[in-house]
Each structure stands twice: as structure tokens, then as C-alpha cells.
Amino acid sequence: MKTGERSPFLTIMLVMGLAFLYIPMILLVIYSFNNSRLVAVWGGWSTRWYVELFKSPEVWDAVILSLQVAVVNATFATVLGTLAGLAMVRFGQFKGRTLFGGMLAAPLVMPEVITGLSLLMLFITLKGIIGWPEERGATTITIAHITFSLAYVAVVIQSRLTGMGQTLEEAALDLGARPFRVLMDITLPRLAPGMVAGWLLAFTLSLDDLVIASFVTGPGSNTLPILIYSRIRTGLRPDINALATIIILAVAIGVAIAGIIMLRQQKQRERELAMAD
């Protein structure tokens, strides 16, 4: 095979992989417009399940709770994960660094069942000792999500910091700038794309979580994945397809917006570097 030629085998494998990933989603979107109550029987095009979905207060409560938890989790996880990443990359060798790195990476490899169970035991113990939390719900879910999301954000930040280098920071320090000023004016702006990526990753992980949330939630505090799972257990329903389609659309829009923002930031940095040269 000549250099630059496409391998038919690789092309076929790529097409098969994309088909395996996206055909189920396409079928889900199509059947969300099915007029029949039977999911597998086509009854014509209709938007009735979207109308019924938007009339359901249970769905709206789950959507609002999931979004609230995801936004708060992503924000706190980004702040804490950024600080942890800075500590691991920019602070050099310090006492306890290996232990800190191991503890930071633990949520990445810990089974979700174990994480959920351990957090449940923590909240039960705290309630017995100090009386908090009075009941499990949005607060406990948010805390649980932050504990594992910040580890993912820290990995993203560490990767970004490693690729950035420290030339500009060192030059600013040599010229008399204070470390805090260097952090705010040089490091964080250059780190912004990584922070945005970490925020989006934490947001997505929170919206997608079922296992951990099911351990630490209480009656009346159902997130969207818990609601979907509870409804599927009683049988697959067309309104679930409609709900899943809306989620897919929202995620696609979010990814597109984030991609546009990051692309603009990248072009702006390239223009600044070109002007500096």
C-alpha cells in the first residue's frame, strides 16, 4: 500500500464502528416519534410522547434536579481539580506528593458500587454523630459527584499543564511579577481551554451517573438517570425514547457550543503568538 492511500480494511472498520455507535441512537430518535404505545410496533409519525413528556411534573422535577446537581458539581469539581492539578505539576516535589497523587487517582479506578456504598456509610455515620444530613437528596448527590468528578478534572488539568511548559511564567517571575499575578494573568488564561473541557466532562459525568446517585439519594429526589431506569424496569415506554432524544439533542448542542468557544480561543492564541513574533 502506497503512503497516503487509505486501507479498505481500516475504512470498513471505521464505518462499522460509527454504525455500531450511532445506529442505536438514530433508531431511538425515530421511534420517539412513533404514535403507537408499543415501542417495537410502528404506528405512524406523531409528537404525542413529547407533549405527554412535557406535561409530566415528575420528569420536570428530575430534569431540574439533575441540572442543578450537574452545574454545582462541575463548578466545584473544576475549581478543586484545577487546584489539585496545579499542585501536582507546578509545585514540584513535596512531602506526601505520591500519597496525594494516589488518593487523587483512586476515584478513577474505584468501582462505582464501592464508591456509592462508602459514601452512603459516610452520610449515615455523619447523621448519627452530628445530625447532618437530615435527609439524603440534592446535597448528598452533589457531594458524591464532586468526589469522583474532581479526579477526572485534575487529570485534564495536569495534561494541559504538562503540555504548556513554564517559559512564560518563569520570564514573568524573572521580571519581578508576583506568583499570584503570574497565576491570574498567565497560567489561568492559558489553562482556560482545559478548565472548560474539565467542566464539561464533570457536567456530563454528573448527568450520566446512576449507580452512585442511587446509593446517596433519598425518597423524592430522583435524578434523570434514576427516573429513566425506574421507568424502564416496568417496561420500555415511548416517552422514554422522547426523553432520551431530548438529552441527545441537548448534549450535541452543548458539545457544539463548547467546540466553537474553544476553536475561537485557539485562533485568538495563534493570532497573539503571531503578533508577538
Model-derived regions: residue spans:
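N-terminal signal-anchor/first transmembrane alpha helix
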Residues: 1-27, 100
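C-terminal transmembrane helix and the adjacent membrane-cytosol boundary/short C-terminal tail
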Residues: 2-12, 92-96, 158-173, 179-186, ...
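Interhelical loop and adjacent transmembrane-helix boundary motif
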Residues: 2-7, 50-59, 207-261, 277
